[in-house]
């Protein structure tokens, strides 16, 4: 094979590029355009985390931009509209289809409705003009409803300096109304406002968990205009299951059974659980209190006795399979240091006791019918067959394939973005704040390098789904439960103890020292430096652990260098946090932390227009307004400019 020199490669590259810019005018126009964009204010970033399958609350936060929509409406209309009119306009932007129906039902005549249409279209056009003031026309055009781009642009950029176009603009709007297009235009404008108030969304982990509709969240994210994802521990569990890890699959099925969410598996992803139910009906009883499903906050009707019985049996069956499947992984991976989690081997089946971490406990609510005392890891032939069928169904689900592929494409374990470090869980450290080391495949890694190796193995496992017990697949499970995992952030997962031991002291899961050291500004500065970020300007944006505001905990830690934004979307945590969690806004002027009240129902917003979200706290104000030049995108644009200037000098100026 002929070696190509760097000079020849550069010439070939410039030759290809010149095909797009075959005149100096075209090239100059592109350079001027990109250089100008660098001077625009940076767009608003919106950070959310720990969605936990709570679609209704999540989509509401997306619609209101964590209060950004109402703030823009107040900026323009507060002095011109009454409180009721402001509330109605806000609700219309949030839920245009629903609010339109309510508003239209109030009018007695077409004439009154038409006047409202004209006024509302004017207000929405004015709002879009304000929300898009820091965008190029090209970027704004992409945010507008395609079928009405021409009409909207005419209204946005209308100029009537010489009174020549007055009737033209009036006819535009009147014809929209006369041809029954006003509803669709208003709906399109409302969604354009939602899109314009947030330039980029960061999802800092855990789309999945105990909530009822993670699939709907995934569909929403797939259609979102610009985002990235930092994987959470629950996200990686689902990725692992799809990638071939039977123990990850057993874990997520157990969680779905525990929280009465098996309809995610059956209805949302079309996976048949009948073989698992048949196995469960054969071996397990319905009266085991430890395995009865938790009551779902969003479900008003109770489970029937038969439904509860079936879920209780499935819950036991899949838990036992999970504990069995963990044993061979722990044994073939001594570097995981998980010998204490060989729980089925530590049970004394004669005395019904277990000895873990040097303590012996009596066991309750046991269901060891399928355990071979001499070989606890052994799966029954039926259990093996059920897991093979379930794994095949998981990997053949088209919807799940689409969702998991999107998670891989848009996701990562951590992300340096615009000077900040986004990470769901933690950076594993010891009590002295030194990065903890972990051995993988004969090499020792810590800090950023360890996270990079973890991510490499997640991607390798995903690409090689046919391998179910290789190192990469085992490491995906380790990320869910291992002591040096950046996602788990604890020393051990005490699932077995929570089911079978009454003494709650055995349930305690010791957190990585990271979680108290992150209060120390010097520690956070060191972490930022270790990840190649400027400790004077950067921050760590963290999810994973609910902030217990009810107990006085502050989400702003280490003098503002650490921001914890576990969204608290999960209803299960709201009694311990006192709120529905936090989101973060970062625009060209600085950062604002937004505290949310519990989202109850959109009906109240539609009828009253009062949004119970948000108390904003300014984290900081930029001394100098940030421009696109100062962002990740700015660096990419600058690289493009440098190449285009190189082409200009090579072809047209020299």
Swiss-Prot record:
Region spans: Disordered: 288-307
GO BP, sorted A to Z: gluconeogenesis
Enzyme Commission no: 3.1.3.11
Pathway entry: Carbohydrate biosynthesis; gluconeogenesis
InterPro entries: FBPtase_class3 (IPR009164), Metallo-depent_PP-like (IPR029052)
Homology family: Belongs to the FBPase class 3 family.
Protein name: Fructose-1,6-bisphosphatase class 3
Organism: Staphylococcus aureus (strain JH9)
């Amino acid at each position: 094979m002929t070696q190509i020199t760097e000079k020849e490669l550069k010439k070939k590259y410039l030759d290809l590029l010149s095909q797009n810019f075959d005149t100096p005018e075209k090239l100059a126009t592109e350079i001027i355009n990109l250089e100008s964009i660098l001077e625009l204010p940076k767009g608003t970033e919106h950070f959310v985390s720990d969605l936990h399958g709570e679609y209704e609350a999540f989509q509401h936060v997306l619609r209101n931009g964590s209060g950004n929509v109402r703030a823009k409406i107040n900026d323009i209309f507060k002095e011109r509209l009454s409180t009721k009119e402001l509330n109605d306009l806000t609700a219309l932007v949030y839920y245009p289809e629903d609010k339109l129906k309510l508003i239209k039902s109030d009018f007695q005549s077409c004439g009154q409705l038409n006047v409202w249409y004209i006024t509302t279209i004017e207000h929405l056009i004015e709002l879009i003009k304000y929300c898009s003031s820091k965008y190029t026309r090209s970027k704004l055009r992409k945010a507008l409803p395609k079928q009405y781009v021409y009409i909207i642009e005419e209204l946005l950029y209308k100029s009537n300096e010489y009174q020549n176009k007055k009737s033209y603009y009036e006819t535009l709007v009147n014809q929209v109304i006369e041809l029954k297009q006003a509803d669709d235009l208003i709906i399109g404008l409302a969604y354009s406002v939602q899109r314009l108030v947030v330039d980029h969304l960061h999802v800092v982990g855990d789309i999945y968990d105990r909530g009822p509709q993670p699939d709907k969240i995934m569909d929403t994210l797939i259609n979102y205009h610009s985002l990235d994802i930092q994987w959470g521990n629950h996200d990686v569990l689902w990725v692992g299951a799809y990638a071939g890890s039977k123990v990850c699959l057993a874990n997520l099925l157990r969680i779905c059974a525990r929280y009465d969410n098996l309809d995610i598996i059956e209805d949302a992803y079309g996976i048949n659980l009948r073989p698992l139910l048949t196995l469960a009906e054969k071996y397990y009883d319905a009266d085991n209190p430890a395995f009865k499903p938790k009551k779902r906050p969003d479900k008003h009707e109770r489970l029937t006795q038969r439904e509860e019985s079936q879920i209780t049996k499935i819950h036991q069956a899949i838990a036992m399979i999970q504990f069995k499947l963990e044993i061979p992984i722990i044994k073939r991976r001594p570097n995981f240091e998980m010998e204490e989690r060989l729980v089925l081997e530590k049970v004394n089946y004669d005395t019904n006791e277990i000895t873990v971490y040097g303590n012996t406990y009596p066991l309750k609510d046991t269901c060891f019918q399928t355990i071979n005392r001499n070989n606890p890891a052994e799966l029954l032939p039926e259990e093996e067959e059920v897991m093979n069928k379930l794994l095949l169904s998981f990997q053949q689900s088209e919807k799940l394939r689409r969702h998991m592929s999107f998670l891989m494409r848009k996701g990562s374990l951590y992300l340096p973005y615009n000077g900040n470090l986004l990470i769901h869980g933690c950076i594993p450290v010891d009590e002295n704040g030194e990065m903890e080391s972990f051995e993988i495949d004969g090499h020792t890694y810590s800090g950023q390098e360890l996270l990079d190796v973890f991510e490499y193995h997640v991607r390798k496992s995903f690409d090689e789904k046919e391998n179910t017990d290789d190192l990469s697949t085992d490491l995906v499970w380790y990320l869910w439960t291992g002591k040096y995992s950046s996602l788990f952030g604890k020393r051990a997962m005490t699932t077995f103890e929570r089911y079978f031991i009454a003494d709650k002291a055995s349930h305690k899961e010791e957190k990585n020292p990271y979680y108290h050291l992150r209060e120390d500004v010097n520690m956070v500065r060191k972490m930022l430096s270790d990840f190649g970020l400027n400790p004077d300007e950067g921050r760590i944006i963290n999810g994973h652990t609910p902030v217990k505001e009810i107990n006085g905990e502050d989400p702003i830690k280490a003098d503002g260098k650490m921001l914890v934004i576990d969204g608290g979307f999960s209803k299960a945590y709201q009694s311990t946090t006192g709120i529905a969690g936090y989101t973060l806004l970062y625009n060209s002027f600085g950062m604002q932390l937004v505290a949310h009240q519990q989202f109850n129902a959109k009906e109240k917003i539609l009828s009253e227009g009062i949004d119970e979200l948000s108390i904003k706290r300014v984290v900081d104000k930029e001394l100098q307004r940030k421009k696109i030049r100062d962002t990740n995108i700015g660096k990419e644009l600058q690289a493009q400019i440098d190449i285009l200037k190189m082409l200009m000098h090579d072809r047209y100026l020299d």
